[in-house]
Each structure stands twice: as C-alpha cells, then as structure tokens.
C-alpha cells in the first residue's frame, strides 16, 4: 500500500484519493450531501487510524535506528549550532529561504487572523537557514489560490454569489471522493478592473472576475468547468476564458508577496509563533505566520549574502556479480562515503566512510564499520537526519545512488530508511521522469522526493549546461579540474570487498574521492551560486531551476511586471505553429587573411531591438487595429515583417520594461564586481551578472517558443527581421564610409556577418590600427540606430581563416595589440565533439602552425606525418574513439546508426553495463569485408584491444580526417592541390598489418610460424630458418632489446597510474575508458605478452651460453 499511495505532507494529513467514487456508474441516483459527508468522515477516520499505526511503527524503528550512532561515534562538528533562545514577541526571525512548497492540512488558528472557515487549507512551507546556520521551517498561512476571467456581458454584482454557488457545486460534483475538500470549493468571487496583456486594445481596463478557490488542485477543474460554461439566471450559460489559471501556487504566492528565489525573509516580532513542541519537521526552528506579515528583502546590498549552508556530497559502492551490473534486489550496498561542507569554508568539515565489514583507518576520515547491511543503511539514514544537509550533491545520485539505496532498503525491509527529507514521517519515494527537447533528445531519469533539501546532481547539471565529449566523472574532472581519478570496474569492487581490511580501505578511499570530486565541481563551476542568483533574478524557487524548463523563469518576471500595471496573462492553448525566418548570415568571402580583421558586435542585440522598438504583447496591434483606434503614423511602427506595434509614447511594453531592469541591474552588478575584493562576494556578483544576461537573452526565446505558455510569432519574427535589416545596414554603412574616396588608405570590406556581428577588413597592416578603426566604426554606426541599440568593437583576428558560414579560426586580440589572447575557433573540428580526438588534435595542431607559427609548410608536413602514422597503425586507439549520445531507442531512429547498433550488441553481451538512453556511447570502426556498412563496423574500444581487432584506417582517413583537413588547407593551398598534397603521395603508401584473432576467415585459418629473420614460413616451432641460423644470436638480441623497451614503457605507464591512484605500492586496477593512459597500458601489456611468446620460440639457452 505504501508503495502505491502518494505520500502526504506530514503527519495528520490524509492522503489524496483518486477521482471517482462509489456512485460513478449510476448517474440516476445521487446520494444526499449528508450521506456523502458521512461516508467521507468514515473513510477519513479509517485513514487516520491507519496512519497513526504506521507512524507508531516508524517511530519505534527510528528510535532503534538512532542507536546506530553511539554518542562517542557522533562528531560534534556534524551537528548544527544550537538555535538561539528567540522571543517571538520581541525578536524577528530572519532566514534565507531555499525551498518553497505547499501542503494541505487542517487550518491552525493564529492570533490576529480571522477564524479559519475550512477544515483543510493550503499552507505554504519555506525551508531555509539563518545567518548563524540554524535550520528553519516557516509555515505560511492564509494564502489561497485564485485566477481571473473576464466578466460576461450583463454580469453585475448581483450575480457574484450565484456564480460562486454554482461553480462551487459543479466542482464538488466533479471532485466526488476528494477527502481534502470538506467545505465550499470556491471561497470568493469578486469584481475588479483589469486588462489582458495580449494586444493593444486602446480601451483601458475592463470588468474581470477574481475567483478564489479552497485548494490549488481545484484550479484545473474550475478552469475546465468555466470554459464549458456555467448557467446563470438571466445570462444563460456563458463560457469563461481563464486568465492566470495555469500559474503554480508557489509562483502565485511569490509574485504577490514580492518574494524571489533564495532571498532573505523576515518574520517581524509579535507576528509569528514558534512551535516549541509538536513540530512537523526536523528543522531546529519551526514557525507559523500569516502570509501578509512576511517581509521579503530584495537581494541587494547586505541581503545578497549567502547563509552558511550545509552541503553534503556522497557516493555508494555495491558488490555486483561477475558481468552483471548491480541490481538492488540482489546486490548489497557495501560502502557509503559522505563529505560535508559549510558554504564559504575552504575545506570539508566532515569525511565519513560507512563500510560493510571491517575497514582499515583512513587519515582525515571517520570510518564506521558494520556487519549487517541493514545496520549500514540505517546508520546512513540516521546520519542524514543528524547532519541535516541543506543541499545534497553527488554524481548520478538522481538515477543511481538514491534510487538504489531506497530500493535496497525496501528489499531488506529497513523501515526508517526512506525518511531522508525534513518532514517527519514523510517517506522519500522514486518516480520515473522523461524529458525530451529538440536540442537534447529524450532523457529518461528518476526523481527522488526529499522535501526540504535541495538536490543538485552534478551529472544532470553538466548534461544541461556543457557540451562535452564524455560525461564520466573521470573525464569531467580532468576537463574542469585538471585531475584524474582511479576508475574501478564494478566487477572488481566485489573482489576488493571480499579481500581484507586493507582492500576495503582502498575501496573506501576510492569511494571518498568519488564523493569529493562533485563537491569540487560544484565549487569550481559555481553551480550553487549561479543557480541561487538565477532564482533571485527570475523570482522562482531554486528547485524549479533544477527540475523545470526555461519558460517558468520568464513567466515569473512577466507576472510581476504585469501585476504592477493591472495586466493579466491569458491561458493560451498551443500545439505548435508556423516557423519564421531566422537571423541573417552575410555570405562569407572565404580565404586566409594575413591582415587584421576587426569584429564589431551588437551588444545584447535581440533585447536591444525589443527595447528600441517597444516590441511586446501589450503593444501588438492586430491587422487593421491602428485604423480602427485612430492611431497616427507617429504612434505606431511597422516592422520589416509587416507586423504593427504601438510606440512607447502610447504605451510602454512589459517586455521592454523587464529587459531594461535586467540590463541595468547587470550593469550595476558588473560595476560592483569590478570594485569588490572579497572572493565570496565576487562569486555572488559574477553569478548575478551572468544570471541577468541569460535571463535577458531568454525573453526573446520565450516569445518564439511555438509550444509554450505565451507564444507570439509577431514579436519573434519582427525581432529577427530587424536583426537582418541591421546587419545589412551595418555592412552598407561601413563599406560606404571607409573608402579611398573618403581619405582612407584602403576601402573597407565586410568579409562576413553572422546574427549579431560583422567582420571588417579595413586594409590596415597592424592590429593597433584595426582596433582604432573598429572602435571608430562602431561609434559611427551606432548613431544610425535608435537607443539602446549599440554596435561595439569586440576584437581583432590576425591572421584570420574564414572557411564557410559558421566556420572560422583566427588569433584573437581584444585588449592589447601586441599580444594575442588565444586562438579562437568556431564550428571547426577543434571544438566539435562528434568526431574522434585524432581529428580535433590534428586540426588544432595544424591551426597552431598556420596561425601562431605562420608555417604552412610545417602544418602540411605535420598532417602528412599523422596520416602516415594512422595508416601504419601507429596511432593509439584512444585517439580513434568516437562518442555519440544515445537519444532514443533503436526503433525510433530513421536509419541505422553506428552507436545505436553497438549499444544493442553490448546489451546482448552484458545487459547490466550496456549504455542506456542519455548515455554517450564510445566506439571505434574496425576493418570488415568490402561493402559492409559503417554502422556494422562499430565496436567497443576495449573489446577491440582484448581481441586484437584491426582498425579500419581508411575509414578514419576518408570519413574523419579528409574533410576537416581540406577545409583548413584549401584556402591556403588551393582546392585541387590541397587534396593532392594531403591525401595522395608517399605518406599514404603504407602497409598495415592485420592482427585480428576473431571474425572473418581468421576464425577458420590455422596459424603457422614464420622465420623472425626473413619471414619464411617454418615447418617447425623454432624461431629462425636454416638460412638465418647463423644470425640467430643477433636476432635474439634484437628481440630482447625490443622486450626491454616495452617493459620500460609499461613500467612508466604503470607508475603514472599508481601516482594517479595515490599509492605506489598497490596494483593498478583502474579501467577508465576516458583516460588515454588506460588504452596505452592495455596495448603495451598485450604487446609484452606477444613479445614474450616470440622470445620463447628461441628455446632455452644452450650450454655454450654459460
């Protein structure tokens, strides 16, 4: 029952019941209201008794569990500081809120508040932390959900009570069996004056109805019933169009009270009540307050600070079976390692390793060992409640660690384990989630509820924010932190666990490192700070940023601005629509430019266009509306796409106001950042200016989202239309002014333009001159556009290689004309991740020789050497690995894909470790019979090494290297010559040696030995033929020398891996597929075995050797 029932908000709150009831099938007979209420009361009483029984069982389990940590085992540093002795009548309660949600519970009487009229009411719950690090839960009472609808013609005050009664009765009938609804569904219907934000109508506010409901979940049925129509005396059955009926209850509350995500809240003295006993949560301070008494501090000045939050990072290890990925129904959890950090401190204050069976001590960490897995799981659950983290992080905790722990505890019947949140008695449950978008494809994931704690899975953050070749923790740590980690295959973990206390210690160190790295990533990438600032800027709860899409952020800002002006957001049904023309790209003048190219960039182009031309929902004129409203030509504009909007002199748009606020706030934040010296405040300010920039740019995207809350094709297509016009005008202005006729040394030419920038060749020879002319041109062109549109000088490229649209490279100069900042590449294989590393490395190396060294001959020679090495099998396999994301099931792909077919084959070999949806699949292309499709030749790199499968080097040359190299060298060498020099010639006449062990004819062929000297086939098992026997000693020495070289190489690689794992005295067991050393070590080990086998053919030394 527990697994199927949706958990409620806390003790004493009955769970919700599914829609429908006893009388659904018999519409002719309806029970009286008294009979319905009587049946409901009996059901509620039964639920209450059942819940009390469950709570007693949980409480006894928890009391037994708390004994898992003896007083001596609990480090005092784990505990939060003791809460102060607050006097609610004299002292305010101030805290930074992290999460806001709501639950439904019996109303509580509060001083100064009217007596509650409902048995069950929605109560908002804000979790947070004080400046001293004390945890707080604030129950906010008295706020009810509401929405608007236009009053139908003829509707007057006399119809208010009738509409309230009829709608309430309709909702009650619709919600039969809803246990929480014990009073009227509609609390109030009021007449007010408002105006729709969609379109300029010219008539000002009109009559609207504000409908207040008893519960948030009644919003959807109320909206549906109103759209169907409600019978009213004298008005017939009018249909009502809902406004703001799709706004989340928490967003509604935050908008109305001017609360933004992660800001500081103040409960004034004398306005709140502390709960000394009977608390519903594990928080140290628990308060009740009326919603109208909460004071919200805007995140500015001293209120920008971040409370000393407790961040917990953890990782688990499981003992799987050979060849099978761990399953929670069968495989035990053997270790759980946790690290705790107080935000703002440089080092974790807590390092804890909980292990199954004894483990040797670990310096700097506390080790707790258990003989029973049930005790281990219960101890970690108890530890979570003792340590009480505000933020929980890790790597893939959302899809593996947390679901595994909960499922395993359920299998072992550990009763108190799932109580991981802050609400007493509320279990953490797992639900499946699926997300699909055009950019990311489909991602299946799990969601674990943990009320009161923010979950930040670093894997999910990186998947959403960064485009990487691989997303394993090892690859990500190397990319961002510059450090590697030992990666132990799940099959080896069981062997370490079954060893002794030292092998278990090694496993615990590995597990601690896996918990430590996500914490480092969280800090290095400023994930928490940036997310908090984004929540503050957009006004949504922190949890929404991590689990919801982009649109809710703009909706929140739109609602806040609209509320100040009496405007309402309509509920728009969208199913996708027509597309529109995107930004302009000026046709590139391809080539290699050995002169400086100045780049001029429009600052915040799309937001600037929307502000300059007052483009908004509120200013949009429908076709013919300008004439009907009697507007003159100077009161509205016609955009390049033919759409019409009123000017700011008639009405200032909401979107331009929002954008002005965001960009001016960003300007202030950047000015403060320039002066600030405190590193923590610098982090906050940097996160704030970034959040403001992203938010401003997302407003345009919100209007263009065809399946969205409020799409408006007229706005989005007008913005891109103005953008195209501006790019073309900029080109014309630059090429008209900077000419020989106007006194300049050379006539300027715009060689390329893309969306918001143009690349200009002024014909000067020095970077300093190009910078001066670029600044002058930017200022001059800006004067031809309305404010705040501004063209800025951004950088100079010298030299510059322009290959095609969206593809170019050059040395970038932005501040100093005498030193380049970096080599900048766009759209080239040096920065793309859909090819093998060999391509990126070769393209980067070639560009460096072309652009930095100015050595085209050296670049050509290097490319030829790499091609020769490839064809002669001298390239390490790690450089040939291609990775592609598995975005959907095999059947959903239109054609056969190499990575999809390999994933299916790997699933047949080992279902547990096969890639799943959302994973990136690494593969190499192997040789096969002529005509075999490429998707059939994909193979797992490790499988290729273990079975000595030959690589299809021609595929890598023709399909991976050829096009990128020709793109770079054709502008320099010429089209025909580049192909002849790079892809033909002596360096391509290399013979590869096939060494496969499986597949094809090799599976049926019988191997015969050859003479090591002359390669003649031998009839015996010796090393040399009779003709080479006089040289046997010389050949033997040569092979021994080769063996020594291989041993030395293997020793160097082994030592490097030992340094990475942190011990020079233990075997290397790392199997990180993202590390090139791993593939080298595997290859050299195999070469060593082959070389030793070859030397054994010489036989034992004869007597003459002694």
Swiss-Prot record:
Quaternary structure annotation from Swiss-Prot or TrEMBL: Component of the tetrameric DNA polymerase delta complex (Pol-delta4), which consists of POLD1/p125, POLD2/p50, POLD3/p66/p68 and POLD4/p12, with POLD1 bearing both DNA polymerase and 3' to 5' proofreading exonuclease activities. Within Pol-delta4, directly interacts with POLD2 and POLD4. Following genotoxic stress by DNA-damaging agents, such as ultraviolet light and methyl methanesulfonate, or by replication stress induced by treatment with hydroxyurea or aphidicolin, Pol-delta4 is converted into a trimeric form of the complex (Pol-delta3) by POLD4 degradation.
Coiled-coil regions, chain positions: none
Regulation: Regulated by alteration of quaternary structure. Exhibits burst rates of DNA synthesis are about 5 times faster in the presence of POLD4 (Pol-delta4 complex) than in its absence (Pol-delta3 complex), while the affinity of the enzyme for its DNA and dNTP substrates appears unchanged. The Pol-delta3 complex is more likely to proofread DNA synthesis because it cleaves single-stranded DNA twice as fast and transfers mismatched DNA from the polymerase to the exonuclease sites 9 times faster compared to the Pol-delta3 complex.
Chief location category: nucleus
GO BP terms: base-excision repair, gap-filling; cellular response to UV; DNA biosynthetic process; DNA replication proofreading; DNA synthesis involved in DNA repair; DNA-templated DNA replication; error-free translesion synthesis; fatty acid homeostasis
Keyword Metal-binding attached: yes
Protein name as annotated: DNA polymerase delta catalytic subunit
Motif (CysB motif): 1057-1075
Taxonomic classification: Eukaryota, Metazoa, Chordata, Craniata, Vertebrata
InterPro entries: DNA-dir_DNA_pol_B, DNA-dir_DNA_pol_B_CS, DNA-dir_DNA_pol_B_exonuc, DNA-dir_DNA_pol_B_multi_dom, DNA/RNA_pol_sf, DNA_pol_B_thumb, DNA_pol_palm_dom_sf, DNA_pol_type-B
Organism: Bos taurus (Bovine)
Zinc finger residue ranges, CysA-type: 1011-1028
Record keywords, A-Z: 4Fe-4S, DNA damage, DNA excision, DNA repair, DNA replication, DNA-binding, DNA-directed DNA polymerase, Exonuclease, Hydrolase, Iron, Iron-sulfur, Isopeptide bond, Metal-binding, Methylation, Nuclease, Nucleotidyltransferase, Nucleus, Transferase, Ubl conjugation, Zinc, Zinc-finger
Function statement: As the catalytic component of the trimeric (Pol-delta3 complex) and tetrameric DNA polymerase delta complexes (Pol-delta4 complex), plays a crucial role in high fidelity genome replication, including in lagging strand synthesis, and repair. Exhibits both DNA polymerase and 3'- to 5'-exonuclease activities. Requires the presence of accessory proteins POLD2, POLD3 and POLD4 for full activity. Depending upon the absence (Pol-delta3) or the presence of POLD4 (Pol-delta4), displays differences in catalytic activity.
Binding site for Zn(2+): 1011, 1014, 1025, 1028
Positions of [4Fe-4S] cluster binding: 1057, 1060, 1070, 1075
Family: Belongs to the DNA polymerase type-B family.
Origin superkingdom: Eukaryota
Any one Gene Ontology molecular-function term assigned to this protein's record: nucleotide binding
Entry EC no(s): 2.7.7.7, 3.1.11.-
Domain comment (free text): The CysB motif binds 1 4Fe-4S cluster and is required for the formation of polymerase complexes.
Disordered, as annotated region: 1-28
């Amino acid at each position: 029952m527990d697994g199927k029932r949706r958990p409620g908000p806390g003790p004493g709150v009955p769970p919700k019941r599914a829609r429908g009831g006893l009388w659904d099938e018999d519409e002719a007979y309806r029970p009286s209201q008294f009979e319905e209420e009587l049946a409901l009361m009996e059901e509620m009483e039964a639920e209450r008794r059942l819940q009390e029984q469950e709570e007693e069982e949980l409480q006894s389990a928890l009391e037994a569990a708390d004994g898992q940590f003896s007083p001596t085992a609990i480090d005092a540093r784990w505990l939060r500081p003791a809460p102060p002795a607050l006097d609610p009548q004299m002292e305010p309660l101030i805290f930074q809120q992290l999460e806001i949600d709501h639950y439904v519970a019996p109303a509580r009487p509060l001083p100064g508040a009217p007596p509650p009229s409902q048995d069950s009411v929605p109560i908002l719950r804000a979790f947070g932390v004080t400046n001293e690090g004390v945890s707080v839960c604030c129950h906010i009472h008295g706020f009810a959900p509401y929405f608007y609808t236009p009053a139908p013609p003829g509707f007057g005050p006399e119809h208010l009570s009738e509409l309230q009664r009829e709608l309430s009765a309709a909702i009650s009938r619709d919600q039969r069996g809803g246990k929480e609804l014990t009073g009227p569904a509609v609390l109030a219907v009021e007449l007010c004056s408002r105006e729709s934000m969609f379109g300029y109508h010219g008539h000002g506010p009109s009559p609207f109805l504000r409908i207040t409901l008893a519960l948030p979940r009644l919003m959807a049925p109320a909206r549906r019933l109103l759209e169907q129509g409600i019978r009213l005396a004298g008005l017939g059955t009018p249909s009502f169009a809902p406004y703001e009926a799709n706004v989340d209850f928490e967003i509604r509350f935050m908008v109305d009270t001017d609360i933004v995500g992660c800001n500081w809240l103040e409960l004034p003295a004398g306005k709140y009540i502390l709960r000394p006993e009977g608390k519903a949560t594990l928080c140290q301070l628990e308060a009740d307050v009326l919603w109208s008494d909460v004071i919200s501090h805007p995140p500015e000045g001293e209120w920008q600070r971040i409370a000393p939050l407790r961040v917990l990072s953890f990782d688990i290890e499981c003992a799987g079976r050979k060849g099978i990925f761990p399953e929670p129904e069968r495989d035990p959890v053997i270790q759980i390692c946790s690290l705790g950090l107080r935000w703002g401190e440089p080092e974790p204050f807590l390092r804890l390793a909980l292990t199954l069976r004894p483990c040797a001590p670990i310096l700097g960490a506390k080790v707790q060992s258990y003989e029973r897995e049930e005790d281990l799981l219960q101890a970690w659950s108890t530890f979570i409640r003792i340590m009480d983290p505000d933020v929980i992080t890790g790597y893939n905790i959302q899809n593996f660690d947390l679901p595994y722990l909960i499922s395993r505890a359920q299998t072992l019947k550990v009763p108190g384990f799932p109580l991981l949140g802050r609400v007493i008695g509320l279990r953490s449950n797992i639900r499946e989630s699926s997300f699909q978008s055009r950019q990311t494809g489909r991602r299946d994931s799990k969601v674990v509820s943990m009320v009161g704690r923010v979950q930040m899975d670093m894997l999910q953050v990186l998947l959403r924010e960064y485009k990487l070749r691989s997303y394993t923790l090892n690859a990500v740590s190397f990319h961002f932190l510059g450090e590697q980690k030992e990666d132990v295959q799940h099959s080896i973990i069981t062997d370490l666990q079954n060893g002794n206390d030292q092998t278990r210690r090694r496993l615990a160190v590995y597990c601690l490192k896996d918990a430590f790295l996500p914490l480092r990533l969280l800090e290095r990438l400023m994930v928490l700070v940036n997310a908090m600032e984004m929540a503050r800027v957009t006004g949504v709860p922190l949890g929404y940023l991590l689990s919801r899409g982009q649109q809710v952020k703009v909706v929140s800002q739109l609602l806040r601005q609209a509320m100040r002006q009496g405007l309402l957001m309509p509920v728009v049904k969208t199913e996708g629509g027509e597309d529109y023309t995107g930004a302009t790209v000026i046709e590139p003048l391809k080539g290699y430019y050995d002169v400086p190219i100045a780049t001029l960039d429009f600052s915040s182009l799309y937001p600037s266009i929307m502000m300059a031309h007052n483009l908004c929902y509120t200013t949009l004129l429908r076709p013919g509306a300008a004439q009907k409203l009697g507007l003159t030509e100077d009161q509205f504009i016609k955009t390049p796409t033919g759409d019409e909007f009123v000017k700011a002199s008639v009405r200032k748009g909401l979107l331009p106001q929002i954008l002005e606020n965001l960009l001016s706030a960003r300007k202030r934040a950047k000015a403060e950042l320039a002066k600030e010296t405190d590193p923590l405040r610098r982090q906050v300010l940097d996160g704030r200016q970034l959040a403001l920039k992203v938010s401003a740019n997302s407003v345009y995207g919100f209007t263009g989202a065809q399946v969205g809350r409020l799409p408006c094709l007229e706005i989005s297509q007008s913005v891109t239309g103005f953008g195209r016009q501006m790019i073309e005008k900029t080109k014309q202005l630059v090429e008209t002014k900077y000419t020989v006729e106007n006194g300049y040394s050379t006539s300027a030419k715009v060689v390329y333009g893309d969306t918001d920038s143009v690349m200009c060749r002024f014909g000067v020879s020095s970077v300093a001159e190009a910078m001066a002319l670029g600044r002058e041109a930017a200022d001059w062109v800006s004067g031809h556009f309305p404010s705040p549109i501004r063209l800025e000088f951004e950088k100079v490229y010298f030299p510059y290689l322009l290959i095609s649209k969206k593809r170019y490279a050059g040395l970038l100069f932005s501040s100093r004309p005498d030193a380049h900042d970096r080599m900048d590449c766009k759209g080239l294989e040096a920065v793309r991740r859909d090819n093998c590393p060999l391509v990126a490395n070769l393209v980067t190396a070639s560009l460096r020789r072309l652009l930095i060294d100015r050595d085209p001959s050296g670049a050509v020679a290097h490319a030829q050497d790499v091609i020769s090495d490839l064809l002669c099998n001298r390239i390490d396999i790690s450089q040939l690995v291609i990775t592609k994301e598995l975005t959907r099931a095999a059947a959903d792909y239109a054609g056969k894909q190499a990575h999809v077919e390999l994933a299916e084959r790997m699933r047949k070999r080992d279902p547990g470790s096969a890639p799943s949806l959302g994973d990136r699949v690494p593969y190499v292309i192997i040789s096969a019979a002529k005509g075999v499709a490429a998707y059939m030749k994909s193979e797992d790199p490790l499988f290729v090494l273990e079975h000595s499968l030959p690589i299809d080097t021609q595929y890598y040359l023709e399909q991976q290297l050829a096009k990128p190299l020709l793109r770079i060298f054709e502008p320099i060498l010429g089209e025909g010559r580049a192909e002849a020099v790079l892809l033909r010639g002596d360096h391509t006449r290399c013979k590869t040696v096939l060494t496969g062990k499986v597949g094809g004819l090799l599976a049926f062929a019988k191997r015969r030995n050859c003479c090591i000297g002359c390669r003649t086939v031998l009839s015996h098992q010796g090393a040399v033929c009779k003709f080479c026997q006089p040289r046997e000693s010389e050949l033997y020495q040569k092979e021994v020398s080769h063996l020594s070289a291989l041993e030395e190489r293997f020793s160097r690689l082994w030592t490097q891996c030992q340094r990475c794992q942190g011990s020079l005295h233990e075997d290397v067991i790392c199997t990180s597929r993202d590390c090139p050393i791993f593939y080298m070590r595997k290859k050299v080990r195999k070469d060593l075995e082959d070389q030793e086998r070859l030397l054994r053919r010489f036989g034992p030394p004869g007597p003459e050797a002694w």
